[in-house]
A protein has these predicted regions:
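Glycan-recognition patch characteristic of GH18 chitinases/ENGases
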Residues: 112-213
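Active-site groove signature of glycoside hydrolases
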Residues: 212-247, 297-306
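Glycan-binding loop/region signatures in secreted carbohydrate-active enzymes
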Residues: 346-348, 353-423, 451-457
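Short, acidic/polar
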Residues: 119-133, 202-225, 277-285, 414-427
């Protein structure tokens, strides 16, 4: 091939955008809409998501081949239908259509992160300068509780074994962030399933919960001389079932009405949908999106926490902390045009940069049934001392191997590559907001290669 386009075609083939199994390029043939979609998805490097995408329902009734590629291209907003549920895969892609597809690709790939949020909780003050660069921060200073006497309180004190409390010297960080133009929210945490049912499944209790929250976000904090909160972030975790789903929405509607009257905003943290279907399904994404100002999808805690004796014996250690296909599945669900958040600008991708899990092997057998969680400094020390690090293109997560006598440690973790990959995928799905759990744990130094995670959002 000596034609003018040879180098471009060769480069495209080398990067997987073209099927190099074919013997001929057929340069004079017209390209079909299906071929164009496949080529663009391959060129973007998302082949590893095709199987997951193919399992989803197609918006088109006439797609019989390359369903995963076309579904992905549709999710990315690269292609659209021809009306009446038709994609017309074998139709010729006109020059106009090809140009439009490529322009959409370019715009998505080069879009900016337009919203950065962080959770501020335990030992977060050390990263106050990072917090000042964010658009909003949620202070993890309260926990919702249903007391034995039937009262519902927003506990902000270190009583009743509560670690979600207002710290000494709170006024300093509030002043610094607000002077920097950062929105400050009160994060209201609840993870007890029984208490969630008691509070949400009773109309009087829902109202009592709303009143307790409103009291906390309107009362004057003495050392500050005013209330520190410009909004509320609801972080009710572990909700399951249709009853809780419905009543959680009722609670949010009531809370939003009260907050709006005070000129305050509402953020809601939600669990992501997962491929196996066994996830926390008590979150009506569409309804929540209509109520909340921001919806934070917590795309973390995917990794195995405990393993069975059989798995230990097998020596199976492939437990990425944020598998790429799972993150895609969650983003697909929360941006679904029928059941997801209608306005994708409200959706925020939540990530946990310090997440990691370690499995220790001896003679090919895993000796710990419970995953080990390391602090990031320990991981950096391992890498500095010669630990072997690899990057899984399938899961888009790094993992390292550490030799310690007769023990081999296998550790899955996050780094700037895995965070960037998730952010890039989210942008392709129309999600340009990110959130971090949590300040104090965001790697922001160039200790080793790919260690400066904060650099991905600066």
């Amino acid at each position: 091939m000596n034609q003018w386009y040879f180098k471009s075609v060769e480069t495209a083939a080398q990067h997987g955008a073209l099927d190099d199994s074919a013997q001929n390029f057929r340069p004079n043939d017209n390209i079909t809409r299906e071929e164009m979609a496949v080529m663009l998805v391959k060129g973007l490097g998302y082949d590893n998501l095709v199987e997951t995408a193919a399992a989803a329902a197609s918006p088109f009734t006439d797609v019989t081949s390359n369903k995963g590629y076309i579904n992905l291209a549709y999710d990315f907003g690269i292609v659209s239908g021809k009306g009446a549920g038709q994609f017309v895969p074998n139709g010729t892609a006109t020059r106009e259509e090809a140009a439009a597809m490529m322009l959409r690709c370019y715009n998505k790939m080069n879009s900016d992160t337009d919203f950065v949020h962080g959770f501020y909780a335990f030992s977060s003050y050390g990263q106050k300068d990072l917090a000042k660069e964010m658009d909003a921060v949620s202070f993890g200073w309260s926990k919702m509780e249903y007391r034995d006497d039937g009262s519902i309180v927003v506990n902000t004190l270190y009583e009743n074994n509560n670690e979600w409390a207002v710290p000494e010297g709170y006024e300093q960080i509030v002043e610094e962030l607000q002077n920097s133009g950062v929105q400050t929210n009160l994060n209201v945490f609840l993870s007890d399933a029984t208490q969630a049912q008691t509070i949400l499944n009773n109309a009087e209790n829902r109202t009592a919960a709303v009143n307790a929250i409103m009291e906390e976000v309107t009362v004057t904090y003495k050392k500050l001389g005013r209330n520190p909160y410009e909004g509320v972030t609801i972080d009710f975790e572990g909700l399951r079932g249709s009853t809780l789903k419905q009543n959680f929405v009722a609670f949010l509607k009531e809370l939003d009405t009260a907050l709006t009257a005070e000129g305050k905003s509402l953020y809601v943290a939600v669990h992501p949908a997962t491929k196996d279907g066994s996830y926390y399904d008590g979150y009506d994404y569409k309804a929540i999106g209509e109520i909340a100002d921001k919806v934070i999808m917590m795309a973390y805690d995917y990794e195995a926490k405990n393993i069975s004796a059989d798995v230990q014996q097998s020596g199976f250690t492939t437990t990425p902390v944020s598998p790429f296909d799972q993150v895609y599945y969650g983003l697909h669900a929360i941006t679904d045009e029928n059941t997801g958040v209608t306005d994708s600008s409200k959706v925020v991708l939540g990530m946990s940069p310090s997440s990691n899990v370690e499995w220790d092997l001896q003679n090919g057998v895993i000796v710990n049934s419970q995953g080990i969680d390391n602090d990031y400094d320990t991981l950096q020390t391992y890498l500095q001392n010669g630990a072997k690090s690899e990057y899984s293109e399938k899961y888009r997560n790094p993992y390292m191997t550490v030799r310690d006598g007769d023990t081999t440690k296998v550790i899955w973790y996050e780094d700037s590559r895995s965070i960037q990959d998730k952010m890039d995928l989210a942008k392709m799905m129309g999600v340009n907001g990110v959130s971090f759990w949590r300040l104090g744990l965001i790697p922001d130094e160039n200790t080793t290669a790919y260690s400066n995670i904060w650099s991905t959002v600066k």
